[in-house]
């Protein structure tokens, strides 16, 4: 399990081009999402929140998120998939957190609906998958 997922980390800039900035932490290459990537130079240290996006890429978001490991926050349900759970927008770029059907009521007619707000925190399983955990 990767212990930087879902938390704030500091990593060194190892590569940059016109579109992307990359940092490395503990041998892991991470794409940086920042409004001003041109401000960073090779060798600079960057602090940000690390997660895996929907394209299965490690991403570091330099803007501190409203939720992270151990910190609960509100997110909006954006989709419901009855064989998986509910997808919640928590403000991470390119990633919605899923609250597993295992953590939801047995009866799907009482599940949260699109537009509902949930109080959740991210968790990481032993396969480095991030899930939303209800308060």
Give the positions of each predicted feature.
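Short aromatic-glycine-enriched beta-strand elements
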Residues: 18-23, 84-87
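Conserved hydrophobic positions within beta-strands
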Residues: 13, 50, 75-77
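N-terminal, Lys/Arg-enriched amphipathic/low-complexity engagement segments
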Residues: 25-55
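A short macromolecule-binding patch
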Residues: 29-35, 94-103
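Short nucleic-acid-contacting surface segments enriched for D/E, G, S/T with interspersed K/R
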Residues: 6-8, 36-48, 105-121
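Short, solvent-exposed interaction modules
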Residues: 67-95
């Amino acid at each position: 399990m990767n212990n930087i997922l879902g938390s704030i980390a500091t990593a060194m800039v190892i590569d940059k081009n016109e579109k992307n900035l990359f940092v490395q932490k503990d041998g892991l290459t991470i794409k940086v999402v920042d409004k001003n990537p041109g401000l960073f130079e090779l060798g600079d240290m960057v602090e940000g929140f690390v997660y895996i996006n929907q394209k299965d890429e490690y991403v570091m978001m330099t803007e501190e998120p409203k939720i992270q490991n151990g910190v609960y926050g509100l997110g909006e349900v954006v989709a419901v998939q009855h064989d998986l759970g509910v997808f919640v927008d928590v403000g991470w770029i390119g990633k919605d957190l899923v609250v597993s059907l295992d953590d939801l009521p047995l009866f799907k007619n009482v599940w949260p609906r699109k537009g509902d707000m949930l109080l959740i925190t991210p968790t990481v399983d032993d396969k480095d998958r991030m899930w939303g955990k209800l308060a």
